[in-house]
A protein has these predicted regions:
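Internal, well-folded beta-alpha domain core
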Residues: 45-211
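Glycine/small-residue-rich interface belts in oligomeric ring/scaffold proteins
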Residues: 1-44
Length: 211
């Protein structure tokens, strides 16, 4: 699930998996223009937290999106495990109702969530800062090379959140069953991100690893 030459990070002895639903807007590659029917779409990713050569980043187990062109481009140019999904995002008051079902297989998510605090910046050394303030992602190319994509963003404007999760089978392809309430919930209204092109850092074919 994670390449053997990436280290799964732990916070106070615990490794974390995140399920992150959101909506993308303004996705474009300079100098191409922003085309709303191409560059705006829902996305849901399943991630864990890794490092290579001392550089902390994110490893995606899966990324689901409703835009088939975006799925193709992300697989082709960023080597990311994108999947095409049927998705619906509806604003409800201050919150969101979010539904996603992968076109193939049983991976699905349904839930409603909303913020319950004012926005704030996480404090260095805390779990929420460790989870959110990451500035690269790792992926594996078709020949087994590990690639790193650097990203830039301002610090996340986080809000505490509550959620009603009606269905979450996003981890079943990993052999993980999710029951009970989420261990940690956050909400963010908006974050602008700049993404660089992937760069090889060396690698091998993946092996199952555990922290």
């Amino acid at each position: 699930m994670v390449p053997s030459n990436l280290t799964i990070q732990q916070f106070d002895g615990t490794a974390w998996i995140g399920v992150v639903p959101f909506h993308m807007e303004g996705v474009m590659r300079r100098p191409l223009p922003d085309l709303p029917w191409v560059s705006a779409f829902p996305e849901l990713n399943v991630r864990t937290y890794v490092e290579r050569d001392g550089k902390a980043g994110v490893w995606f187990f899966s990324l689901d999106a409703s835009n088939s062109l975006a799925v193709w481009a992300a697989r082709r140019f960023f080597h990311l495990p994108y999947f095409h999904a049927s998705m619906q995002v509806v604003a409800q008051g201050h919150g969101i109702d979010y539904r996603s079902r992968r076109k193939t297989g049983n991976a699905a998510f349904e839930g409603s969530y909303e913020p319950v605090s004012q926005p704030y910046a996480s404090t260095p050394g805390t779990l929420e800062h460790w989870l959110t303030e990451r500035y690269c992602l790792y992926a594996e190319s078709s020949d087994g090379t590990i690639v790193r994509t650097d990203v830039h963003h301002r610090q996340w404007p986080l809000q505490k959140a509550r959620a009603e999760i009606r269905r979450n089978t996003m981890l079943e392809p990993l052999g993980v069953s999710v029951t009970g309430e989420a261990s940690l919930l956050h909400f963010s209204r908006r974050l602008d991100v700049v993404v660089w092109s992937p760069e090889p850092v060396g690698g091998t074919r993946p092996y199952l690893t555990s922290p």
